[in-house]
């Protein structure tokens, strides 16, 4: 195991416990299992500061925080995917934590979960994928734009005012 893996396991423990959810005994046991496997309790793990906790502290609004959390969860899912292990206990611990992270992030919505997993599996180095992504870029950028929501809000406000004025 390398130093980076140790840090990741330690950060996972911190994120799961500090994200506003209560640590259940089952998940605590699984996290302890991973900490032991990665030797994440070693004092040198703290060298260089935290990976994610300080970033999470910077974001106060729930919607903004959810965006950051989705990136962090994506990171852990990829890390666990790369750490396929023959040790059944460790693999079970990683699978249990993956399930819980996704459930908490996506509020146990199976369709959101499927879409999230589909998105993180898209290979970014594939030329065909890149071509499709560029082709869809304008639509994605429009969807990200707050103007479309502002226009809808203004229209609904004008309709409401019009009804009120006619009474």
From Swiss-Prot:
UniProt GO cellular component terms: extracellular space
Tissue: Released primarily from activated T lymphocytes.
Regions that span the bilayer: none
Signal peptide region: 1-23
GO molecular function: cytokine activity; type II interferon receptor binding
Glycosylation sites: 39, 107
Binding partners and assembly: Homodimer. Interacts with IFNGR1 (via extracellular domain); this interaction promotes IFNGR1 dimerization.
Similarity remark: Belongs to the type II (or gamma) interferon family.
Protein name per UniProt: Interferon gamma
